[in-house]
């Protein structure tokens, strides 16, 4: 019985064949459940209209198992529209109550990904959600005037005879003028230069090394973005550890700064990679074979086979994850707006600046089936050829596994320490030399416990990533010093107990998750974000069906930048928002 329970949980987690027992109904808009993810306002004052808006796509995805991609010609904002900030709005409606499967979606312009998102759970009366994202940093692609540029939305799903729901998706872009009002909660710091560049991306004649100094901060807009994506322009589907996706790129020799931005999501057997016990445990206990790779995954990026950066992804819990009742109507961190990850390639420009093709390879260490990954290479151009030298040293890594188990009870601990330090020298045509040193420390700790004959699963995980960038001139004087610190703790417990009657169990669940990020310049914090989630609840489960569920979800969000602060606190009880307070008081 107990072993069965564990298998049940593993099945719940790994096969995702959860079906809802709700009925088919198509109800009016007013009754539709409105889902949302906590974030700070992207527009300071909702009364201030955008300078202009463009509706890019209206499409109804019907059978998304055969037709996952929808592509139209991209419509840029009118050239007369004055703007400094672009906000992408993705709205979706689902009219069916049956599909409990989470679907992942992405939005691309000219194969450059702008948003990775996932679907909300359907409810009896249908559901509705809207995602807004500041996409200003993609300005070079947003302003493209080439009328054959593609605009694509992909919605990937499992579909079968029982899942007849349709997704209606509308995507728009709203453009706001920075100068028209104070923009207190901009997610972009110091981007005035970026704004100037916005409108004339191909004429960079006036740019010299002066710009190289002032423009370093991460969120200034790149002059060019090169997609590192699948053949058809979309995500790479990575099936296993040896599945290496390669793209050839040849970059402009005027490049003085490059950042690779990765979009990553895990699905199928890999959706709950952080809750995976090692092979030895699953084998000895005769559990579902091949599904016990342990809880370490890392996305590796190489240039011509040389490792240049890695990402240990932050778990994103989809809307039917762990306990579906948790995520109604407030979803988990990143469910609607997946984080993307930056790898600074500036110190590695010496590997790329020779007018030749270079191979950028992406793979998932210990990865199984499947991961959806792609990348955007953001490139900043100077006015003349840049010479670059790299002192290449591969990142170092230490991994420690500590496994101990007897029968179904056990403790599995993994600790990974990854550190890298790269120094690159770039010299502009004018002879100025700038040295960029990027050091990064990644720390991953995953402690997984199976107790009480495997009926109690406890996870305690922490991911920490600290990046330092130091820029110096030819005489060794500091020009800039940036530091980014991110911490992502996650605690999950799942306790399964038999209920009266055959095959029925109660499953008690908790999820405590945090996202904490800060960005500082010369030790002054320019931007900080703190998002806490605390959910507790239980479900009554029969086989693979959830019969009923109850939940409490508390979330706190705090954001601060050079212009102001924003905080919001939301409490949800059994799917009803019982408290929702926000203010703009700064907490020291
Ligand atoms: C959802 O809407 C589509 C199109 O309007 C309709 O064909 C379909 O029957 C609806 N599905 C349900 C479950 O109501
Ligand atoms: C939802 O719509 C269906 C038919 O469209 C209707 O029969 C049903 O009563 C509605 N449900 C509720 C709870 O109003
Ligand atoms: C989407 O629908 C709206 C309202 O019907 C329409 O004004 C708009 O042109 C449509 N957009 C596209 C891209 O078809
Ligand atoms: C969706 O496509 C699949 C695969 O072609 C097919 O088996 C299924 O019947 C289709 N479902 C609907 C509702 O059309
Ligand atoms: C898939 O969608 C495209 C429009 O994006 C449509 O032209 C095509 O007929 C669809 N194919 C199938 C098999 O439904
Ligand atoms: C999309 O646009 C159409 C036409 O304007 C509208 O009828 C529909 O309600 C919109 N859907 C969503 C999800 O906003
Ligand atoms: C669906 O709509 C009906 C009618 O407004 C309402 O009574 C019912 O509670 C709604 N169901 C859900 C799950 O929100
Ligand atoms: C695209 O632009 C070219 C040149 O400006 C023009 O000839 C062509 O008709 C345009 N195509 C579309 C679909 O607007
Ligand atoms: C659809 O639902 C029926 C009844 O619950 C079930 O017997 C059948 O296996 C399901 N089909 C699929 C493809 O899941
Ligand atoms: C890994 O996945 C690729 C792509 O699906 C496949 O061709 C290859 O056979 C797989 N390798 C292993 C060892 O499973
Ligand atoms: C990349 O370039 C290499 C050598 O230049 C070539 O052999 C390879 O086929 C190219 N790969 C792709 C995917 O274009
Ligand atoms: C989470 O919330 C529960 C009550 O719902 C509380 O007992 C617990 O201490 C909270 N945990 C954290 C880490 O805040």
Regions found by a protein language model. Give the residues of each.
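Intrinsic disorder/low-complexity detector
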Residues: 4-7, 213, 221, 582
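Extended extracellular/luminal ectodomain segments enriched in beta-structured repeat modules
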Residues: 78-89, 251-259, 267-270
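A generic signature of intrinsically disordered, low-complexity regions enriched in glycine/proline
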Residues: 6-9, 195, 223, 227, ...
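Beta-strand-rich ligand-recognition modules
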Residues: 19-58, 63-70, 76-79, 91-210, ...
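Cleavable N-terminal signal peptides of Sec/SRP-targeted secreted and luminal proteins
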Residues: 2-21
């Amino acid at each position: 019985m107990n072993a069965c329970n564990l298998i049940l949980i593993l099945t719940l987690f790994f096969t995702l064949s959860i079906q809802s027992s709700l009925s088919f109904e198509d109800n009016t808009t007013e009754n539709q459940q409105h889902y949302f993810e906590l974030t700070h306002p992207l527009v300071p004052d909702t009364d201030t209209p955008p300078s202009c808006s463009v509706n890019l796509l209206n499409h109804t995805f019907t059978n998304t198992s055969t037709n996952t991609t929808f592509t139209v010609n991209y419509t840029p904002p009118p050239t007369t529209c004055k703007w400094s900030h672009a906000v992408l709005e993705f709205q979706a409606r689902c009219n069916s109550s049956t599909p409990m499967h989470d679907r992942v979606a992405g939005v691309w312009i000219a194969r450059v990904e702008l948003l990775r998102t996932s679907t909300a759970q359907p409810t009896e009366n249908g559901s509705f959600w809207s995602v807004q994202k500041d996409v200003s940093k993609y300005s070079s692609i947003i302003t493209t005037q080439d009328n054959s540029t593609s605009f694509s939305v992909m919605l990937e799903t499992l579909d079968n005879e029982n899942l007849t729901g349709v997704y209606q998706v509308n995507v728009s872009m709203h453009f706001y003028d920075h100068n028209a009002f104070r923009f207190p909660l901009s997610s972009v710091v110091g981007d005035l230069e970026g704004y100037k560049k916005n409108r004339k991306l191909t004429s960079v004649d006036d740019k010299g090394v002066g710009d190289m100094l002032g423009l370093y901060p991460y969120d200034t807009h790149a002059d060019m973005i090169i997609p590192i994506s699948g053949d058809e322009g979309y995500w790479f589907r990575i099936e296993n550890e040896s599945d290496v996706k390669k793209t050839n790129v040849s970059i402009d020799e005027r490049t003085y700064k490059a950042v690779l931005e990765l979009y990553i999501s895990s699905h199928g057997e890999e959706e709950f990679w952080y809750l995976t016990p090692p092979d030895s445990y699953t084998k000895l206990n005769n559990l579902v074979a091949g599904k016990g790779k342990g809880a370490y995954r890392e996305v590796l990026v190489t240039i011509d086979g040389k490792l240049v950066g890695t990402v240990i992804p932050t778990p994103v819990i989809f809307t039917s994850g762990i306990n579906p009742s948790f995520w109604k109507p407030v979803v988990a961190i990143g469910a609607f707006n997946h984080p993307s990850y930056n790898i600074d390639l500036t110190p590695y420009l010496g590997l790329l600046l020779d007018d030749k093709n270079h191979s950028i390879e992406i793979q998932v260490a210990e990865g199984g089936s499947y991961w959806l990954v792609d990348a955007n290479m953001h490139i900043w151009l100077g006015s003349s050829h840049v010479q670059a030298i790299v002192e290449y040293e591969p990142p170092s890594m230490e991994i420690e596994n500590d496994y101990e188990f007897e029968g179904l009870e056990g403790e599995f601990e993994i600790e990974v320490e990854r550190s890298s330090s790269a120094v690159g020298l770039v010299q502009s045509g004018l002879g100025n030399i700038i040295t960029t040193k990027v050091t990064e420390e990644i720390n991953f700790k995953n402690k997984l416990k199976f107790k009480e004959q495997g009926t109690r699963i406890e996870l305690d995980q922490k991911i920490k990533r600290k990046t330092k960038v130091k820029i110096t001139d030819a005489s060794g004087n500091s020009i800039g010093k940036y530091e980014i610190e991110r911490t992502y703790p996650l605690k999950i417990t799942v306790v399964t107990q038999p209920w009266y009657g055959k095959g029925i169990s109660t499953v008690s669940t908790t999820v405590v998750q945090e996202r904490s990020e800060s960005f500082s310049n010369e030790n002054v914090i320019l931007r900080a974000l703190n998002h806490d989630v605390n959910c507790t609840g239980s479900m009554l489960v029969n086989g693979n069906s959830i019969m009923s569920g109850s939940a409490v979800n508390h979330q706190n969000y705090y954001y601060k930048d050079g212009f102001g602060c924003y905080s919001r606190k939301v409490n949800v009880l059994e799917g009803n928002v019982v408290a929702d307070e926000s203010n703009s008081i700064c907490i020291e």
